[in-house]
Amino acid sequence: MCVFFGECNKVCEHSILAGMDMKEETRLLVIARRNAIPNDERIARSEKACEELEQYFSRTVASGARIAAYHAMGSEVDIAPFAKSAHMHGWTCAFPVMMRDDNDAKDRMTFWDVPLDGTRRAFFDKPARAVTPDDPSLAGCTPCNPREIDAVIVPMVAFDAGNMRLGYGGGNYDRFLRELRSDAVVCGIAFREQEVEAVPTEPHDLALPKIIVA
């Protein structure tokens, strides 16, 4: 089994883990490639991607819009520069929170408005974990109805030329994107090292309308 990477440098990498499914294999290989990007380069390329993201939303999203952003984990594209400057366009940024549901075996991804003050720092200082609505880390934050979100920035593990996306396996964004209004602007963001020849897909998977490549 092999996966091909890059547009100019498509190198076949053979799995050494017997019995691993194609999606898991792709995740491990691509995350390793993303982790190998030097930190200084990752920061510079993230900043450039944020500039492109800001230009794109300036053309497609109205002032006063609410944008579902994210806080970068590990070696993901860091969109913090975009989140910090969004208010200059009149945009509000919401961030994902895994919400614990006692009536459901699975935690649910929700989005919350996080103010541009010490609240945001305290919010991000908490490790990724499932919480309940009364968790102290959410003090000063406001939950968002998916129908009130005007645009979404989608992180990912891998993508291909057809804009198919591979996530981390929880299905959180797959479910969330289906809850949005039909006119919501959806934009993925990733490093070029995350491109593969073909993302392993299932019949229900949908391509993203746009992906900004850093």
Write out the residue ranges for each language-model feature.
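Surface-exposed, charge/polar-rich loops and edge strands
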Residues: 4-21, 25, 32-39, 139-152, ...
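N-terminal active-site beta-alpha-beta segment that forms phosphate/nucleotide-binding
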Residues: 16-147
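Short, structured patches in soluble enzyme cores that scaffold and shape functional sites
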Residues: 71, 97, 113, 156, ...
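Short glycine-rich anion-binding loops that position phosphate/pyrophosphate groups of nucleotides
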Residues: 73-75, 157-161
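Short N-terminal helix-initiation segments at or just after the protein's N-terminus
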Residues: 133, 154-156
